[in-house]
């Protein structure tokens, strides 16, 4: 099962045409290969922040249609996921650009990774190169 980072969902639902096509094409290939997808409640929250406002009804409907897709599970965040996110932030860093002291993963990224691991996902799909070398789950950067 592939856990989808919020940016992948945003690309798939309303990304610029090139990013949207990349996301939809890659997800279609994965689905044809028999893979299923998961998102967390946090992913839903991140995706919906910019859509709550005047005149955003269609955008909101588009996201909810995606969230209720037949090949997608939504995971509630658990205490175990929060504990693992704390451990990720405490134990893991990524190289800073330009080179400086390594940086700790942000809370949202740590929660996304923790949710994917705790739920038993095989891969975390993102477009964030800073997550690519995280060691506890396979991280795939959108091609």
Give the location of each predicted region:
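Short, well-structured N-terminal submotif of metal-dependent ribonuclease cores
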Residues: 1-39, 51-65, 129
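Active-site phosphate/pyrophosphate-handling residues
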Residues: 7-8, 46, 110-114
């Amino acid at each position: 099962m592939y856990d989808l980072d919020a940016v992948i969902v945003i690309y798939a639902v309303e990304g610029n045409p090139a990013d949207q096509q990349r996301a939809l094409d890659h997800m279609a290939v994965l689905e044809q290969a028999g893979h299923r997808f998961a998102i967390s409640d946090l992913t839903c929250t991140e995706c919906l922040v910019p859509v709550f406002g005047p005149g955003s009804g269609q955008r909101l409907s588009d996201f909810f249609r995606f969230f209720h897709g037949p090949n997608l599970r939504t995971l509630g965040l658990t205490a175990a996921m929060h504990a693992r996110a704390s451990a990720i932030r405490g134990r893991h860093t990524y190289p800073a650009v330009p080179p400086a002291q390594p940086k700790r993963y942000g809370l949202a990224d740590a929660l996304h990774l923790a949710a994917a691991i705790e739920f038993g996902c095989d891969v975390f799909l993102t477009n964030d190169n800073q997550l690519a070398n995280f060691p506890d789950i396979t991280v795939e950067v959108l091609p």
